[in-house]
Amino acid sequence: MASQLSYLQRELLQALLESGVTKEALKKALADGDDYTYPNVPLDDIRNLDEGENCVQLPNGLGESHISEDESSDDGEDFTPPIMKELERLSPEEAAHQKAVVERLLQEDSWHVAKLVKSYLQQHNIPQREVVETTGLNQSHLSQHLNKGTPMKTQKRAALYTWYVGKQREIARLFTFTEFTHAGQGLITDDMSCDEVPTKKMRRNRFKWGPASQQILFQAYERQKNPSKEEREALVEECNRAECLQRGVSPSQAQGLGSNLVTEVRVYNWFANRRKEEAFRHKLAMDTYNGQQNSAPTLSAHDLPHGKTYGFRYIQDSSTDRSAVMANSQSTPSPSALEPSHSLMNSDSKMIPVSGGSLPPVSTLTALHNVDHSQHTLGQTQNLIMASLPSVMTIGTDTALGPAFSNPGSSTLVIGLASQTQSVPVINSVGSSLTTLQSVQFSQQLHPSHQLHPSHQQPIVQQVQSHMAQNPFMATMAQLQSPHAIYSHKPDVAQYASAGFFPQTMVITDTSNLGTLTSLTPSKQVVPLHTTAHGDAPGSQLQNQDSSILHLPLCHRLSPIPTVSSASLVHYHNSSSPENHSHLLSPSHNTIDSFISTQMASSSQ
């Protein structure tokens, strides 16, 4: 027989034997249980239990019992179920039937009954708070009993089962009788007078969305965040139908849902709350993002110690097209992966994933917008920052470069023309080697006559379209320029209108040639520059006795109008005095204009 008992039943049997009950008494109680008849004691006498008077002992344990200190209630006092007073309002037949059902549930496995009660609560969306207020049970104890099967005293289980049976009868009446069709109305019988209404006002049951209705509403929210009145009414019918099917009743009996009946107002409020939550989450995310921007420190070039170079590592894709192009930024849209383009100018933007790796934002490398172009002082060179970036454009080949440096290679240069004076970033890169970045002031005013020759525009546009598709970063850099920005190929490097076009300069070098560059001393030479029209085909070269001077091929002009006939070029020669290495440009020059020519040449270092 012991093998047929569950664990809880064996524990209960062991507790009965330890309480002093003999086996013979248990057998006699089991034999007399079927023939037991309830005494004709008025239900009003139940309140005599509080006065300590003798009463008939019931086999289900509802009578007075002597419990140990460990079995005492959570409040430290004897537990008197308030639900028992509700039996007074029932007719004798209903009260007897309910007691019989409760007695049968007490004889079953408590864990099995607890799962039945929990399933019923979930099916009808009944909160545990309602059970606690009606039965007087402890919220934590009830939750543990329903979820984990924690043992509960017989009196408390009897109170729980009494509420469970009464709630089943109440809900059945709501779905059966048509007079109980108004949502939120309590179950009031004809024989209940106003005097019998309990003096304690019970809190109204709060409406709770069921899982079936929530699934329907979330699917509708994905389609339309602000539905119309007709759409909300259709959702009401769909939700009530799902709630009825969840409870196992016909959808035509939706009014029997009582306080759980879905209405159009509740659907409207649900959608309004979802929109508010979405807006709040968006605002919270933006506040967090802006807070990180304001709290993040910004490193400038002069904050870094001399002699050390800090930069970003970038693994460049070998398949990247390194052909140079010249284009208008308006003709090529920015790729969607890098939109919006102003995110590159954010000092706290995250690494942007591209095909070759993670590309750091431009303005995280140098303070581009804080450079005053009117101050031609040496202090501006301190804004130069070394970093490793991928090549944006190639404007030179190994064969076209001079022997000034020991490690020649393809270099990159971003050149732009602006219709208004502004500072924009200029990137010079040598593959994955060391790169110098500094802002360049584009102050040349473009005239309508200063346009490219029509014969050169068509092949340039075609070359731009093919290159932009393979190099998305360059398209984004084009948006950083003005609408008149132009990117130029090395054989077609423009001869600009004045020697003051670039009031700031750029220096690019390879890591292996950094020591060579810093050990060079400047020497100034005046070289005549022949000014020809745009259609001049022959090219001239700058010749010098020193082999370290680069050859500068004559390039096309932006305008057929001759402008400047001569200017100054500064070339570096090797020197054995590398003491002054604090800046890339020599401190002996108090202006940067002396380093600028009307012709722009780029060399690999």
From Swiss-Prot:
One term under GO cellular component: nucleus
SUPFAM superfamilies noted in UniProt: Dimerization cofactor of HNF-1 alpha, Homeodomain-like, lambda repressor-like DNA-binding domains
Gene: hnf1a-a
Subcellular location: Nucleus
Listed GO MF terms: DNA-binding transcription factor activity, RNA polymerase II-specific; RNA polymerase II cis-regulatory region sequence-specific DNA binding
InterPro entries the record matches: HD (IPR001356), HNF-1 (IPR039066), HNF-1_N (IPR006899), HNF-1_POU (IPR044869), HNF1_dimer_N_dom_sf (IPR023219), HNF1a_C (IPR006898), HNF1b_C (IPR006897), HNF_P1 (IPR044866)
Record key words, sorted: Activator, DNA-binding, Homeobox, Nucleus, Transcription, Transcription regulation
Ranges of the DNA-binding region feature: 202-282
Protein name: Hepatocyte nuclear factor 1-alpha-A
Residue stretches making up the POU-specific atypical domain: 85-180
Residue span of region Disordered: 57-81, 321-343
Annotated region described as Interaction with DNA, given as residue ranges: 128-130, 141-147, 153-156, 206-209, 266-268, 273-276
Superkingdom, natural source: Eukaryota
Region Dimerization: start-end pairs: 1-31
Role description: Transcriptional activator that regulates the tissue specific expression of multiple genes, especially in pancreas and liver. Binds to the hepatocyte specific promoter element HP1. Binds to the inverted palindrome 5'-GTTAATNATTAAC-3'.
Annotated GO biological process: insulin secretion; liver development; pancreas development; positive regulation of DNA-templated transcription; regulation of transcription by RNA polymerase II
Record organism: Xenopus laevis (African clawed frog)
Subunit-level organization: Binds DNA as dimer. Forms a homodimer or heterodimer with HNF1-alpha-B. Potentially also form a heterodimer with HNF1-beta.
Residues of the HNF-p1 domain: 1-32
Region Not present in other members of the HNF1 family: start-end pairs: 448-453
Expression across tissues: Protein expressed in liver, stomach, small intestine, colon and kidney. Not expressed in spleen, lung, blood, heart muscle, skeletal muscle, testis and brain.
Compositional bias (Polar residues): 321-335
Motif extent (Nuclear localization signal): 200-208
Family (UniProt): Belongs to the HNF1 homeobox family.
